[in-house]
Amino acid sequence: MPAAPGWIASARRVPSTNFDARPAGVAIDLLVVHHISLPPGRFSGDAVERLFTNRLDPRADPSFEALRGLRVSAHFLIRRRGELLQFVATDDRAWHAGASRFMGRERCNDFSIGIELEGDGEHRFTEPQYRRLARLIERLRARHPLRWIAGHSDIAPGRKHDPGAFFDWGRLLALPEAGGLARPY
């Protein structure tokens, strides 16, 4: 069965309601790479899915209290073993970048696709994550006029620090599937 427009067939769908329509006529030309782990430093649970679908119980972990009432999402999450989850269709605007600026343009959510990597900024990302990210980039470039890639820290400096020092930009951009994207930082 083919995927619906804006959905990747190979991704596990976990639909979020934390999205809205992009402004008319805006080209989707930027990928934003993030990292996330909930609770911090722990991998493999379902807390990220629960956060992006407004089902995270703030009592489940002391660190979750700060997330109470937060309404956020990303288009994709890539787990440590390379599993791909999709929360929002790429044609829609996920709520991943917050207050942000890229090459003089404000509100990066309007023209970007947000990709979360399961990670915490303290550990290296995995080979399956890099491979899955490269394949995802290849698929997204077939649908959208993507030209740029940046980290959340690039578009929200001082406010955000992901994907962090352990993300190897050279390694990603050397993969053939990720070729053609520019990182102006």
Task: Give the positions of each predicted feature.
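Basic/polar, cationic surfaces and motifs that engage anionic cell-wall
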Residues: 1-9, 24, 106-111, 120-185
